[in-house]
Structure formats: C-alpha cells, structure tokens
Amino acid sequence: IGIGRIELPTALSFADSGFVTIGIDINTKLVEMINSNEYPLKDEPGFDKIFDNVVKNGKLSATSNISNALPKCDVILLSLPTPMNKENIPDYTALLTVGKSLNSLLSNGQIVIVESTVEPGFIETELLDCIEGQDKSLKSGIDFHLAVCPETANPGEIMKDFQKLPRLVGAIEEKISPIVSALYTHVFNVELIPMPNCKTANAVKLTTNVFRDINIAFINELALLFEKLGIDTHTVIEAAKRKYNFQAHFPGPGVGGPCLPVNSYQYLNSSKKINESFLKIVQEAR
C-alpha cells in the first residue's frame, strides 16, 4: 500500500522474484500509468526493464480500490508517507487511515509489514490499536500478524541499496520474524538482522538518520567558526580523517528531502511523551 519513489521499486522487486504483486495507491494517475505499462520513475535507473517485464507478465498491477485488493493478499506492505505538520509534529494520518481500513478487511491471518519510518512504540500502540479496532474486533496474532522492516534506500541509488544494504526485521510476535526474514531474503538476497521487537527496529532506522542530521549541523557550525578564524574547513576535515574513528561530514545547506528533517522530530516527539529534557542536542541541531 503506497507505490511512490521507494515503494514502487519495492513492489517491482517482489514481482520480479515471482510474487503476484498489487500496488495500491490513492493516486489514480499513477495507477493508470502502471496498468498502461508506462514506467513513472524515469530518473531511477535499473528498474525500467523489470517494470516492463512484470507488467506484461501479469506479476504487477495497480489499483486504488483497497477493498477489492486486500482479500487477495497474504502479505501486505505499508509504505506510506510520515511527514510533519506545521507544528513539526509527525503526521501519521496516512498510516492510521489505512489501519482503520485494515480493521474491516483482514481476517485470514495475513502478515502486515510496515516499511514506513515511524517513532519507536507507534507500531505497538497506535497502529496496532487502529487495526484491531476500538471494539477489538480483530486480534493480533490470530486475525493478522504485524511486523516491521524499515525501508533503507536513497533515491537515485535504490537498486544498488536494495542489493547491498542489510535489512532490519521486528514483529509483535517473535515467531513471525523468521517468516518475514525468509520473505525478504528471497526477494532481495541480503542479510536480515532480527530485532527483539518493532520499536527497536524503528529506533535503529531513526538513529542512523538523526546521527547524520546532528553531525551535519555540527560541521556547519564549525564551518562558520572557522570562517571567522581564517581556517579552511575542508583542510581540517581531510586531516581529521586520518584517525580511524572520525566519520567525516562536510558543510552544506543542511539536510533535506522527505526523511532526515522529519526523523529528528519523530525522536523529539517520542522524547516529549516521556520527558522533554531528553534529546536537547537533537532540538539544537534542528
């Protein structure tokens, strides 16, 4: 569910590995392009030939009708946007809206895998409650199984990242993790790293991105200082790289894109729910 910049290559990878795959998206124009065998990601190399093959062979189709598509599925991937609102609070509306739809559509023990980046604990609380429903009409572990496998790929290098980067897997029920691992190993042929639960897997994904955000902010501050001191920033960084445990970051306009700026606020949102004194350095880096 969700066939955007990262999600469509994911769907193509599943279809190319032999699975009959249905891409579900509210963007009807995108759905029409896919079903018309018109590849929508012109600037993403490596997937165009796969796209042509799997669409022609009937392995990949697209629809905006979630009610018709889901009963046909054994495994459901959620790869939906998790942006910020105007108050810099993570907006999980897309995931929660789909979660409510799943409540009326699941019943056969399907596995639901969340690839979207979310704050630790969101899966086990808000999303799980949403899928089970207020009246607990569905039961996790009986009517469906919930797991996570956070996506890890950079636009423009998605195929290369899919083929080399290990993936994390966590689940509400421990017994589901090996099943998800086997599925992703079959599709991507990469290492799957089991996590003890969903929130740990989500924390790892956030930590890798927020680490970059903080260090980029730090080096930008240093660059401003060095300019006043008459020191060349790049000379300092290149010389500092001689030490094996120094991880080089370079000054620039700051982080951008749909992920890194949001990820820091996801951690900050988590922190505020517990104790606002946590993660001051993350707030300063923003």
Regions found by a protein language model. Give the residues of each.
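Structural/interface elements that position substrates and couple domains in central-metabolism enzymes
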Residues: 1-286
